[in-house]
Amino acid sequence: MNAVTGLVFNIQRFSTDDGPGIRTTVFLQGCPLRCKACSNPEGLIARPQLMYRASKCIGAGQCGFCLPKCPEGALSVGADGRVVVDFAKCTGCGACADVCPSRAMEIVGRRMTVDEVLAVVEADEAFYARSGGGITLSGGEVLRQGRFARALLQEARRRGLGTAIETSGMGRWPVLESLLPFLDVIHYDIKCLDRERHRRFTGLPNDLILRNFRKLCAVFPHDRIIVRTPFIPGVNGTVEDVRAIGEFLRGIGDDLHYELLPYHRYGESKYGFLGLTPPMTAVVPTAEEAAVHAELTRYRARERATVPLSPAQGAPLVERLRRPTAR
């Protein structure tokens, strides 16, 4: 029995974008970055949090079970009869969610053991065997829960499951290094090379991320590293931005894989459920960014695979972005 515990805010089955084959993605809670385009804001803080979907609330007149349960007095009744949450008072205790029949109130983030997580993961073991899939740890940031991540990966490997992580690289190198013996694939985010722009977008500079990436490439097989850049208007959306990252990677090795991810706003509604304001609702892409994004989206629709950086194998989109623009 493996009793090591960690904070998990979601377990997503049948994932096809988080590594080879069909996978189960385990999302670990807690992240040092505050990316303005984060699609999982419920994974930023390392503690259980309340997500409240007011549209699902039955209303205090027909229900109201939650109102007397809150020990902090964070719940009241709005003008439309639905419950209103004062998130400044909420501690995420879960008393309201326990009695909510419509699941308008939900606690995200709970402490789980390695065995509890793998019990969910192994339910789809037959699909992993046929597709070459397995378990992927994501977040949040995996490196924030290094001991739990290592225990999960080690036990998954012992049970014959394929293993992968998705990381920003924002963590201590010894933590990342400790995971390597138990990993088949690493997805590594490099959002932006410009230090100050990275700080403005994520809250922190990228020195540690790039330093850890260089160390990783020195000790881990390049063909098992997939570098990802989520396309973000105002951050890395121009041809020059993407080309700079491509050239940086080629300076390390042509056998790395590079994946450009189209811009999306999937996580925007979650901010409201957490009582937060989405930080990027007003972002409007420039004409150049819109053109690059349109080409990227068309390319991704045709080719789902990752893109080798080798000129001999390079994909049309990436090669086009590498070429100097006409003046």
Question: Could you tell me what each predicted segment is?
Answer:
Residues 52-55, 199-205, 274-283:
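Short glycine-enriched, charge-decorated loop/helix-capping segments at active-site entrances
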